Protein backbone atom coordinates (compact mmCIF):
# COMPACT_ATOMS: atom_id res chain seq x y z
CA UNK A 1 0.00 0.00 0.00
CA UNK A 2 1.42 3.39 -0.97
CA UNK A 3 2.12 5.45 2.12
CA UNK A 4 0.07 8.62 2.50
CA UNK A 5 1.48 11.70 4.18
CA UNK A 6 -0.27 14.65 5.76
CA UNK A 7 -3.62 12.85 5.89
CA UNK A 8 -6.23 14.96 7.67
CA UNK A 9 -7.80 13.09 10.60
CA UNK A 10 -9.78 15.93 12.13
CA UNK A 11 -12.94 14.84 10.31
CA UNK A 12 -13.94 11.86 8.15
CA UNK A 13 -12.23 11.94 4.77
CA UNK A 14 -13.89 14.44 2.45
CA UNK A 15 -15.08 13.01 -0.90
CA UNK A 16 -13.27 14.25 -3.97
CA UNK A 17 -15.36 14.69 -7.11
CA UNK A 18 -13.74 14.31 -10.52
CA UNK A 19 -15.33 15.51 -13.76
CA UNK A 20 -16.15 12.79 -16.27
CA UNK A 21 -18.48 12.45 -19.23
CA UNK A 22 -21.86 10.75 -18.93
CA UNK A 23 -20.72 7.46 -20.41
CA UNK A 24 -17.84 7.22 -17.96
CA UNK A 25 -20.18 7.91 -15.06
CA UNK A 26 -22.53 5.21 -16.28
CA UNK A 27 -19.68 2.74 -16.49
CA UNK A 28 -18.60 3.64 -12.97
CA UNK A 29 -22.08 2.98 -11.63
CA UNK A 30 -22.01 -0.52 -13.04
CA UNK A 31 -18.68 -1.47 -11.52
CA UNK A 32 -18.73 -4.73 -9.54
CA UNK A 33 -18.95 -4.25 -5.77
CA UNK A 34 -15.98 -6.57 -5.40
CA UNK A 35 -13.68 -3.90 -6.91
CA UNK A 36 -13.03 -1.34 -4.17
CA UNK A 37 -11.31 2.05 -4.11
CA UNK A 38 -10.84 4.71 -1.50
CA UNK A 39 -10.38 8.47 -1.88
CA UNK A 40 -8.05 10.12 0.61
CA UNK A 41 -7.82 13.90 0.88
CA UNK A 42 -4.31 15.15 1.59
CA UNK A 43 -3.22 18.23 3.51
CA UNK A 44 -6.58 19.14 5.07
CA UNK A 45 -10.32 18.67 4.99
CA UNK A 46 -11.06 21.20 2.23
CA UNK A 47 -12.77 19.45 -0.69
CA UNK A 48 -10.80 21.63 -3.09
CA UNK A 49 -7.52 20.33 -1.75
CA UNK A 50 -5.43 18.06 -3.91
CA UNK A 51 -6.24 14.35 -3.62
CA UNK A 52 -4.82 11.02 -4.66
CA UNK A 53 -6.96 7.98 -5.31
CA UNK A 54 -5.85 4.47 -4.47
CA UNK A 55 -7.44 1.07 -4.83
CA UNK A 56 -7.41 -1.30 -1.85
CA UNK A 57 -4.45 -3.11 -3.40
CA UNK A 58 -2.51 0.15 -3.62
CA UNK A 59 -2.83 0.61 -7.38
CA UNK A 60 -4.38 3.57 -9.18
CA UNK A 61 -8.07 2.88 -9.85
CA UNK A 62 -9.73 2.93 -13.21
CA UNK A 63 -12.86 4.33 -11.56
CA UNK A 64 -12.87 6.88 -8.73
CA UNK A 65 -14.55 5.94 -5.47
CA UNK A 66 -15.23 8.14 -2.50
CA UNK A 67 -16.17 7.34 1.10
CA UNK A 68 -19.72 7.92 2.28
CA UNK A 69 -20.40 8.11 6.02
CA UNK A 70 -23.45 7.01 7.96
CA UNK A 71 -23.02 9.94 10.35
CA UNK A 72 -20.99 13.11 9.87
CA UNK A 73 -18.86 13.38 12.98
CA UNK A 74 -15.33 14.19 14.07
CA UNK A 75 -15.42 11.99 17.20
CA UNK A 76 -12.37 9.86 18.01
CA UNK A 77 -13.82 6.63 16.58
CA UNK A 78 -14.91 8.20 13.27
CA UNK A 79 -11.57 9.94 12.88
CA UNK A 80 -9.76 6.65 13.45
CA UNK A 81 -12.00 4.90 10.92
CA UNK A 82 -11.18 7.61 8.38
CA UNK A 83 -7.48 6.93 8.80
CA UNK A 84 -7.90 3.14 8.68
CA UNK A 85 -10.25 2.90 5.71
CA UNK A 86 -7.51 3.45 3.12
CA UNK A 87 -5.80 0.24 4.29
CA UNK A 88 -6.58 -3.16 2.82
CA UNK A 89 -5.65 -5.62 5.58
CA UNK A 90 -8.10 -6.54 8.32
CA UNK A 91 -5.56 -5.73 11.02
CA UNK A 92 -5.02 -2.23 9.65
CA UNK A 93 -8.77 -1.64 9.21
CA UNK A 94 -9.45 -2.57 12.86
CA UNK A 95 -6.33 -0.90 14.27
CA UNK A 96 -7.17 0.92 17.50
CA UNK A 97 -10.93 0.72 16.98
CA UNK A 98 -11.71 -1.78 19.74
CA UNK A 99 -9.91 0.30 22.35
CA UNK A 100 -11.51 3.50 21.04
CA UNK A 101 -15.02 2.03 21.33
CA UNK A 102 -14.52 1.03 24.97
CA UNK A 103 -12.82 4.32 25.81
CA UNK A 104 -15.99 6.12 24.71
CA UNK A 105 -17.49 5.09 28.05
CA UNK A 106 -15.32 7.73 29.71
CA UNK A 107 -17.73 10.40 28.46
CA UNK A 108 -20.67 8.60 26.85
CA UNK A 109 -22.66 5.64 28.18
CA UNK A 110 -25.09 5.49 25.26
CA UNK A 111 -25.36 3.69 21.93
CA UNK A 112 -23.09 4.50 19.00
CA UNK A 113 -23.05 3.55 15.34
CA UNK A 114 -20.79 4.54 12.46
CA UNK A 115 -19.99 3.10 9.06
CA UNK A 116 -18.19 4.16 5.92
CA UNK A 117 -18.61 2.68 2.45
CA UNK A 118 -16.73 3.35 -0.79
CA UNK A 119 -19.04 4.52 -3.60
CA UNK A 120 -18.39 5.44 -7.23
CA UNK A 121 -17.92 9.21 -7.44
CA UNK A 122 -21.17 10.98 -8.09
CA UNK A 123 -23.37 8.37 -6.43
CA UNK A 124 -26.13 10.30 -4.64
CA UNK A 125 -26.48 10.08 -0.87
CA UNK A 126 -29.08 7.49 0.11
CA UNK A 127 -28.85 5.59 -3.17
CA UNK A 128 -29.80 1.93 -3.40
CA UNK A 129 -26.12 1.09 -3.90
CA UNK A 130 -25.14 2.87 -0.69
CA UNK A 131 -27.96 1.24 1.26
CA UNK A 132 -26.96 -2.20 -0.04
CA UNK A 133 -23.26 -1.76 0.72
CA UNK A 134 -23.96 -0.47 4.22
CA UNK A 135 -26.34 -3.34 4.96
CA UNK A 136 -23.85 -5.87 3.59
CA UNK A 137 -21.10 -4.49 5.81
CA UNK A 138 -23.28 -4.57 8.94
CA UNK A 139 -24.49 -8.10 8.16
CA UNK A 140 -21.03 -9.41 7.28
CA UNK A 141 -20.47 -12.82 8.87
CA UNK A 142 -16.76 -13.03 8.05
CA UNK A 143 -14.18 -10.42 9.05
CA UNK A 144 -16.35 -9.53 12.02
CA UNK A 145 -15.48 -9.31 15.72
CA UNK A 146 -18.03 -8.81 18.48
CA UNK A 147 -17.67 -8.36 22.24
CA UNK A 148 -20.51 -8.79 24.73
CA UNK A 149 -20.10 -7.70 28.34
CA UNK A 150 -22.70 -8.24 31.06
CA UNK A 151 -22.25 -6.04 34.11
CA UNK A 152 -22.91 -7.00 37.72
CA UNK A 153 -26.04 -4.83 37.71
CA UNK A 154 -27.41 -6.70 34.68
CA UNK A 155 -26.74 -4.21 31.89
CA UNK A 156 -25.44 -5.64 28.61
CA UNK A 157 -22.93 -3.96 26.31
CA UNK A 158 -22.48 -5.21 22.73
CA UNK A 159 -19.65 -3.97 20.52
CA UNK A 160 -19.30 -5.02 16.88
CA UNK A 161 -16.63 -4.35 14.25
CA UNK A 162 -17.40 -5.44 10.67
CA UNK A 163 -15.31 -5.14 7.54
CA UNK A 164 -15.57 -5.89 3.85
CA UNK A 165 -13.58 -4.53 0.92
CA UNK A 166 -15.92 -1.59 0.34
CA UNK A 167 -17.13 -0.99 3.88
CA UNK A 168 -16.17 -0.62 7.54
CA UNK A 169 -18.72 -0.53 10.36
CA UNK A 170 -18.71 -0.29 14.17
CA UNK A 171 -21.56 -0.40 16.67
CA UNK A 172 -22.02 -0.04 20.42
CA UNK A 173 -25.31 -0.98 22.02
CA UNK A 174 -26.22 -0.77 25.71
CA UNK A 175 -29.31 -2.69 26.78
CA UNK A 176 -31.06 -4.26 29.79
CA UNK A 177 -30.21 -1.42 32.14
CA UNK A 178 -28.04 1.63 32.71
CA UNK A 179 -24.33 1.53 33.41
CA UNK A 180 -23.03 2.77 36.74
CA UNK A 181 -19.97 5.01 36.82
CA UNK A 182 -17.92 2.16 38.29
CA UNK A 183 -19.05 -0.21 35.53
CA UNK A 184 -18.12 2.35 32.88
CA UNK A 185 -14.67 2.53 34.42
CA UNK A 186 -14.38 -1.27 34.37
CA UNK A 187 -15.32 -1.29 30.68
CA UNK A 188 -12.59 1.23 29.90
CA UNK A 189 -10.02 -0.94 31.67
CA UNK A 190 -10.72 -3.70 29.13
CA UNK A 191 -9.86 -1.43 26.19
CA UNK A 192 -6.23 -2.50 25.81
CA UNK A 193 -7.11 -6.17 26.29
CA UNK A 194 -9.85 -5.99 23.66
CA UNK A 195 -7.57 -4.27 21.16
CA UNK A 196 -4.78 -6.79 21.77
CA UNK A 197 -7.28 -9.61 21.15
CA UNK A 198 -8.40 -7.92 17.91
CA UNK A 199 -4.82 -7.45 16.74
CA UNK A 200 -4.08 -11.14 17.29
CA UNK A 201 -7.24 -12.37 15.58
CA UNK A 202 -6.79 -10.00 12.62
CA UNK A 203 -3.16 -11.05 12.11
CA UNK A 204 -2.09 -13.44 9.37
CA UNK A 205 -2.18 -16.17 10.51
CA UNK A 206 -4.57 -15.42 13.41
CA UNK A 207 -3.29 -15.83 16.96
CA UNK A 208 -4.98 -15.85 20.35
CA UNK A 209 -4.05 -12.98 22.67
CA UNK A 210 -6.94 -13.09 25.10
CA UNK A 211 -5.38 -12.76 28.54
CA UNK A 212 -6.28 -9.06 28.69
CA UNK A 213 -9.96 -10.02 28.53
CA UNK A 214 -9.56 -12.22 31.62
CA UNK A 215 -8.42 -9.31 33.79
CA UNK A 216 -11.64 -7.75 35.01
CA UNK A 217 -13.23 -7.04 38.37
CA UNK A 218 -15.96 -9.66 38.81
CA UNK A 219 -17.71 -7.43 41.35
CA UNK A 220 -18.40 -4.99 38.48
CA UNK A 221 -18.48 -7.17 35.36
CA UNK A 222 -20.27 -10.53 35.42
CA UNK A 223 -19.05 -11.97 32.12
CA UNK A 224 -17.13 -11.22 28.94
CA UNK A 225 -17.80 -12.96 25.60
CA UNK A 226 -15.98 -12.52 22.31
CA UNK A 227 -16.90 -13.96 18.93
CA UNK A 228 -14.80 -13.54 15.81
CA UNK A 229 -14.94 -14.80 12.26
CA UNK A 230 -12.12 -14.00 9.84
CA UNK A 231 -10.95 -15.27 6.48
CA UNK A 232 -7.83 -17.46 6.39
CA UNK A 233 -6.75 -18.55 2.93
CA UNK A 234 -10.27 -18.07 1.62
CA UNK A 235 -11.79 -20.15 4.43
CA UNK A 236 -13.52 -19.09 7.63
CA UNK A 237 -11.72 -19.13 10.99
CA UNK A 238 -14.02 -18.68 14.00
CA UNK A 239 -13.06 -17.96 17.59
CA UNK A 240 -15.32 -17.93 20.65
CA UNK A 241 -14.26 -16.85 24.14
CA UNK A 242 -16.12 -16.67 27.45
CA UNK A 243 -14.98 -15.63 30.91
CA UNK A 244 -16.77 -15.16 34.23
CA UNK A 245 -15.92 -15.70 37.89
CA UNK A 246 -16.29 -19.49 37.61
CA UNK A 247 -14.86 -20.45 34.23
CA UNK A 248 -12.96 -19.49 31.10
CA UNK A 249 -13.44 -21.11 27.72
CA UNK A 250 -12.05 -20.55 24.25
CA UNK A 251 -12.79 -22.56 21.12
CA UNK A 252 -11.66 -22.14 17.53
CA UNK A 253 -12.50 -23.78 14.22
CA UNK A 254 -10.74 -23.20 10.93
CA UNK A 255 -8.98 -24.72 7.93
CA UNK A 256 -6.42 -26.54 10.09
CA UNK A 257 -8.92 -28.03 12.55
CA UNK A 258 -10.66 -27.32 15.85
CA UNK A 259 -9.58 -26.68 19.43
CA UNK A 260 -11.14 -25.99 22.81
CA UNK A 261 -9.66 -25.06 26.19
CA UNK A 262 -11.75 -24.72 29.35
CA UNK A 263 -10.49 -23.66 32.78
CA UNK A 264 -12.53 -24.22 35.95
CA UNK A 265 -12.20 -21.38 38.47
CA UNK A 266 -14.65 -22.81 41.00
CA UNK A 267 -11.95 -24.65 42.99
CA UNK A 268 -9.31 -22.00 43.66
CA UNK A 269 -7.91 -23.84 46.70
CA UNK A 270 -5.62 -25.81 44.39
CA UNK A 271 -4.13 -22.75 42.67
CA UNK A 272 -0.46 -22.20 43.46
CA UNK A 273 1.85 -19.23 43.17
CA UNK A 274 2.37 -17.36 39.91
CA UNK A 275 5.87 -18.88 39.71
CA UNK A 276 4.54 -22.43 40.09
CA UNK A 277 1.83 -21.81 37.49
CA UNK A 278 4.38 -20.41 35.08
CA UNK A 279 6.49 -23.54 35.43
CA UNK A 280 3.45 -25.78 34.93
CA UNK A 281 2.39 -23.90 31.79
CA UNK A 282 5.92 -24.22 30.44
CA UNK A 283 5.84 -27.99 31.07
CA UNK A 284 2.52 -28.40 29.31
CA UNK A 285 3.57 -26.33 26.30
CA UNK A 286 6.59 -28.62 25.98
CA UNK A 287 4.26 -31.64 26.04
CA UNK A 288 2.18 -30.11 23.24
CA UNK A 289 5.33 -29.61 21.15
CA UNK A 290 6.36 -33.21 21.79
CA UNK A 291 2.90 -34.45 20.76
CA UNK A 292 3.07 -32.41 17.56
CA UNK A 293 6.49 -33.83 16.74
CA UNK A 294 5.47 -37.41 17.44
CA UNK A 295 2.13 -37.21 15.63
CA UNK A 296 3.14 -34.78 12.85
CA UNK A 297 0.40 -32.33 13.87
CA UNK A 298 -0.35 -29.16 11.94
CA UNK A 299 2.00 -26.43 13.17
CA UNK A 300 -0.56 -23.60 12.96
CA UNK A 301 -3.19 -25.58 14.89
CA UNK A 302 -0.74 -26.51 17.65
CA UNK A 303 0.53 -22.92 17.86
CA UNK A 304 -3.02 -21.61 18.37
CA UNK A 305 -3.69 -24.40 20.90
CA UNK A 306 -0.63 -23.36 22.88
CA UNK A 307 -1.79 -19.74 22.82
CA UNK A 308 -5.23 -20.80 24.05
CA UNK A 309 -3.85 -22.91 26.90
CA UNK A 310 -1.46 -20.21 28.07
CA UNK A 311 -4.02 -17.39 27.84
CA UNK A 312 -6.78 -19.28 29.66
CA UNK A 313 -4.42 -20.19 32.51
CA UNK A 314 -3.10 -16.64 32.95
CA UNK A 315 -4.07 -14.21 35.72
CA UNK A 316 -5.54 -16.83 38.06
CA UNK A 317 -3.33 -16.15 41.09
CA UNK A 318 -5.00 -12.85 42.01
CA UNK A 319 -8.44 -14.47 41.99
CA UNK A 320 -7.16 -17.26 44.26
CA UNK A 321 -5.61 -14.79 46.68
CA UNK A 322 -8.83 -12.77 46.86
CA UNK A 323 -10.88 -15.92 47.48
CA UNK A 324 -8.51 -16.99 50.25
CA UNK A 325 -8.77 -13.60 51.93
CA UNK A 326 -12.56 -13.69 51.72
CA UNK A 327 -12.87 -17.28 53.03
CA UNK A 328 -10.00 -17.92 55.47
CA UNK A 329 -11.92 -20.72 57.21
CA UNK A 330 -12.18 -22.79 54.02
CA UNK A 331 -9.74 -25.61 53.22
CA UNK A 332 -6.58 -24.32 51.56
CA UNK A 333 -3.37 -26.04 50.47
CA UNK A 334 -0.10 -25.30 52.21
CA UNK A 335 3.33 -25.36 50.57
CA UNK A 336 3.78 -29.11 51.08
CA UNK A 337 0.42 -29.84 49.49
CA UNK A 338 1.15 -27.58 46.55
CA UNK A 339 4.46 -29.32 45.93
CA UNK A 340 2.46 -32.40 44.86
CA UNK A 341 0.11 -30.51 42.53
CA UNK A 342 0.64 -28.45 39.39
CA UNK A 343 -0.60 -25.17 40.84
CA UNK A 344 -2.94 -24.74 37.87
CA UNK A 345 -6.70 -24.45 38.05
CA UNK A 346 -8.47 -27.54 36.70
CA UNK A 347 -8.80 -27.63 32.93
CA UNK A 348 -9.70 -29.67 29.88
CA UNK A 349 -8.12 -29.03 26.49
CA UNK A 350 -8.36 -30.68 23.09
CA UNK A 351 -7.41 -30.15 19.46
CA UNK A 352 -8.37 -32.11 16.36
CA UNK A 353 -6.73 -31.62 12.99
CA UNK A 354 -8.72 -31.61 9.77
CA UNK A 355 -8.64 -35.15 8.34
CA UNK A 356 -7.01 -35.57 4.92
CA UNK A 357 -6.59 -38.54 2.57
CA UNK A 358 -3.38 -37.86 0.63
CA UNK A 359 -3.08 -41.32 -0.96
CA UNK A 360 -5.52 -41.76 -3.87
CA UNK A 361 -4.49 -45.41 -4.14
CA UNK A 362 -5.52 -46.12 -0.52
CA UNK A 363 -8.07 -43.55 0.53
CA UNK A 364 -8.71 -45.31 3.84
CA UNK A 365 -5.22 -44.20 4.93
CA UNK A 366 -6.04 -40.87 6.53
CA UNK A 367 -3.69 -38.28 7.95
CA UNK A 368 -5.08 -37.42 11.40
CA UNK A 369 -4.04 -35.72 14.63
CA UNK A 370 -6.11 -35.60 17.81
CA UNK A 371 -4.88 -34.63 21.27
CA UNK A 372 -6.65 -34.24 24.62
CA UNK A 373 -5.35 -33.35 28.06
CA UNK A 374 -7.04 -32.56 31.35
CA UNK A 375 -6.59 -31.98 35.06
CA UNK A 376 -9.24 -32.62 37.71
CA UNK A 377 -8.84 -32.07 41.44
CA UNK A 378 -10.85 -32.72 44.56
CA UNK A 379 -10.43 -31.09 47.96
CA UNK A 380 -12.49 -32.67 50.74
CA UNK A 381 -12.64 -33.12 54.52
CA UNK A 382 -14.36 -31.56 57.52
CA UNK A 383 -11.74 -28.85 57.94
CA UNK A 384 -8.14 -27.82 57.43
CA UNK A 385 -6.84 -30.42 59.92
CA UNK A 386 -8.60 -33.33 58.21
CA UNK A 387 -8.25 -32.41 54.56
CA UNK A 388 -7.75 -34.73 51.61
CA UNK A 389 -6.56 -33.70 48.14
CA UNK A 390 -6.44 -35.68 44.91
CA UNK A 391 -5.31 -34.42 41.54
CA UNK A 392 -5.52 -36.40 38.30
CA UNK A 393 -3.71 -35.42 35.08
CA UNK A 394 -4.28 -37.21 31.77
CA UNK A 395 -3.29 -36.93 28.12
CA UNK A 396 -4.25 -38.85 24.98
CA UNK A 397 -2.74 -38.70 21.50
CA UNK A 398 -4.08 -40.37 18.38
CA UNK A 399 -2.40 -39.63 15.05
CA UNK A 400 -1.61 -41.07 11.66
CA UNK A 401 0.51 -39.79 8.80
CA UNK A 402 2.40 -40.73 5.63
CA UNK A 403 6.13 -40.31 5.26
CA UNK A 404 8.54 -40.59 2.35
CA UNK A 405 11.10 -43.38 2.43
CA UNK A 406 13.77 -40.80 1.68
CA UNK A 407 14.02 -37.82 4.01
CA UNK A 408 15.14 -35.43 1.26
CA UNK A 409 12.52 -36.54 -1.29
CA UNK A 410 9.04 -35.01 -0.92
CA UNK A 411 6.14 -37.47 -0.86
CA UNK A 412 3.82 -37.13 -3.89
CA UNK A 413 1.35 -40.00 -3.85
CA UNK A 414 -0.68 -40.75 -6.99
CA UNK A 415 -2.40 -43.80 -8.44
CA UNK A 416 0.87 -44.63 -10.22
CA UNK A 417 2.53 -47.47 -8.31
CA UNK A 418 5.92 -45.83 -8.91
CA UNK A 419 4.85 -43.13 -6.44
CA UNK A 420 3.73 -45.65 -3.82
CA UNK A 421 6.97 -45.77 -1.83
CA UNK A 422 6.27 -44.66 1.73
CA UNK A 423 5.59 -45.57 5.35
CA UNK A 424 2.23 -45.11 7.03
CA UNK A 425 2.40 -44.42 10.77
CA UNK A 426 -0.37 -44.86 13.35
CA UNK A 427 0.21 -43.47 16.85
CA UNK A 428 -1.77 -44.07 20.06
CA UNK A 429 -0.43 -42.68 23.36
CA UNK A 430 -1.86 -42.35 26.87
CA UNK A 431 -0.41 -40.89 30.06
CA UNK A 432 -1.69 -40.24 33.57
CA UNK A 433 -0.49 -38.91 36.90
CA UNK A 434 -2.45 -39.04 40.17
CA UNK A 435 -1.38 -37.33 43.38
CA UNK A 436 -3.06 -38.14 46.71
CA UNK A 437 -2.58 -36.22 49.96
CA UNK A 438 -4.41 -36.80 53.28
CA UNK A 439 -4.28 -35.42 56.83
CA UNK A 440 -5.68 -36.75 60.10
CA UNK A 441 -5.96 -34.21 62.91
CA UNK A 442 -3.31 -32.06 61.27
CA UNK A 443 -0.86 -34.92 60.72
CA UNK A 444 0.14 -35.85 57.18
CA UNK A 445 -0.79 -39.52 56.73
CA UNK A 446 -0.61 -39.98 52.96
CA UNK A 447 1.42 -38.44 50.13
CA UNK A 448 1.59 -40.68 47.08
CA UNK A 449 1.98 -40.36 43.33
CA UNK A 450 1.00 -42.93 40.69
CA UNK A 451 2.04 -42.39 37.07
CA UNK A 452 1.65 -44.38 33.88
CA UNK A 453 2.53 -43.99 30.21
CA UNK A 454 1.86 -46.10 27.15
CA UNK A 455 2.78 -45.63 23.51
CA UNK A 456 1.85 -47.69 20.48
CA UNK A 457 3.51 -47.12 17.12
CA UNK A 458 2.41 -49.03 14.05
CA UNK A 459 4.45 -48.59 10.86
CA UNK A 460 3.44 -50.08 7.50
CA UNK A 461 6.05 -49.90 4.76
CA UNK A 462 5.15 -49.87 1.06
CA UNK A 463 7.40 -50.21 -1.97
CA UNK A 464 5.92 -49.90 -5.46
CA UNK A 465 2.47 -50.14 -3.89
CA UNK A 466 3.18 -53.44 -2.13
CA UNK A 467 3.26 -53.64 1.67
CA UNK A 468 6.53 -55.28 2.65
CA UNK A 469 6.29 -54.86 6.45
CA UNK A 470 3.75 -54.12 9.17
CA UNK A 471 5.25 -53.61 12.61
CA UNK A 472 3.64 -52.47 15.87
CA UNK A 473 5.86 -51.38 18.75
CA UNK A 474 4.24 -51.02 22.19
CA UNK A 475 5.88 -49.30 25.15
CA UNK A 476 4.46 -49.20 28.68
CA UNK A 477 5.63 -48.02 32.08
CA UNK A 478 4.16 -47.37 35.53
CA UNK A 479 5.70 -45.69 38.53
CA UNK A 480 4.54 -45.29 42.15
CA UNK A 481 6.15 -42.92 44.63
CA UNK A 482 5.60 -42.33 48.34
CA UNK A 483 6.60 -38.86 49.53
CA UNK A 484 5.33 -39.23 53.11
CA UNK A 485 8.71 -39.62 54.79
CA UNK A 486 10.17 -36.78 52.71
CA UNK A 487 7.32 -34.32 53.24
CA UNK A 488 6.76 -34.79 56.97
CA UNK A 489 9.99 -33.10 58.10
CA UNK A 490 9.62 -30.43 55.41
CA UNK A 491 6.13 -29.62 56.61
CA UNK A 492 7.51 -28.74 60.03
CA UNK A 493 9.76 -26.13 58.40
CA UNK A 494 6.89 -24.22 56.80
CA UNK A 495 7.03 -21.71 59.64
CA UNK A 496 10.68 -20.91 58.93
CA UNK A 497 11.50 -17.20 58.98
CA UNK A 498 15.16 -17.03 58.01
CA UNK A 499 15.94 -16.54 54.34
CA UNK A 500 18.29 -19.54 54.33
CA UNK A 501 15.69 -21.91 55.80
CA UNK A 502 12.98 -20.66 53.45
CA UNK A 503 15.29 -21.13 50.48
CA UNK A 504 16.13 -24.71 51.50
CA UNK A 505 12.45 -25.52 52.00
CA UNK A 506 11.47 -24.08 48.63
CA UNK A 507 14.25 -26.00 46.86
CA UNK A 508 13.22 -29.28 48.47
CA UNK A 509 9.56 -28.76 47.59
CA UNK A 510 10.48 -27.74 44.03
CA UNK A 511 12.34 -31.03 43.63
CA UNK A 512 9.17 -32.92 44.53
CA UNK A 513 7.02 -30.70 42.34
CA UNK A 514 9.29 -31.42 39.39
CA UNK A 515 8.16 -35.07 39.51
CA UNK A 516 4.37 -34.69 39.57
CA UNK A 517 3.77 -33.67 35.95
CA UNK A 518 2.64 -36.01 33.21
CA UNK A 519 5.41 -38.03 31.61
CA UNK A 520 4.07 -39.32 28.26
CA UNK A 521 7.28 -41.16 27.33
CA UNK A 522 7.39 -44.67 28.89
CA UNK A 523 11.16 -44.92 28.49
CA UNK A 524 11.71 -41.68 30.41
CA UNK A 525 9.24 -42.71 33.10
CA UNK A 526 10.93 -46.08 33.46
CA UNK A 527 14.33 -44.41 33.89
CA UNK A 528 13.03 -42.36 36.84
CA UNK A 529 12.51 -45.42 39.04
Q: PLM features: what roles do these ranges have?
A:
Residues 1-85, 152, 169-172, 502-529:
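Short, compositionally biased, intrinsically disordered N-terminal export/targeting signals
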Residues 20, 242-529:
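A eukaryote-biased signal for long
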Residues 41-49, 60, 73-84, 101-112, ...:
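Short, flexible helical or helix-coil boundary motifs
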Residues 61-129:
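N-terminal "first-domain core" detector
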Residues 105-224:
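N-terminal, intrinsically disordered, small/polar-rich Type III/flagellar export signal
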Residues 154, 166, 177-181, 231-235, ...:
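Generic "edge-of-domain/loop-turn" microfeature
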Residues 209-249:
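Short helix-loop boundary/capping segments
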Amino acid sequence: MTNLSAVSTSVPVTPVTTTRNASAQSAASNQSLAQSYTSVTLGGSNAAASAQLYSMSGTAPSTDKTPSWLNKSNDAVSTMMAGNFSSSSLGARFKGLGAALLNRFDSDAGNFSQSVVALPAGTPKGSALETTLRAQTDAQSDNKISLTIVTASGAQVDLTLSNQEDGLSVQVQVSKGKLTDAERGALQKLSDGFQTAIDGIAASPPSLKLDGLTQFDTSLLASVDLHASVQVGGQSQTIDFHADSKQRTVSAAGPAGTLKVSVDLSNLAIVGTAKQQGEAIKRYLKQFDDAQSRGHGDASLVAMFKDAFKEMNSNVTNAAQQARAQSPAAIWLNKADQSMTTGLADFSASMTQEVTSPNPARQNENDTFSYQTSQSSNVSGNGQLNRAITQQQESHLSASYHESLLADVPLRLTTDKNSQNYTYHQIKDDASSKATIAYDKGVLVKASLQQSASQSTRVQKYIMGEMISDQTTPQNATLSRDFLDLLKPLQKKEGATSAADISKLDQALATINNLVYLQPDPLTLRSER
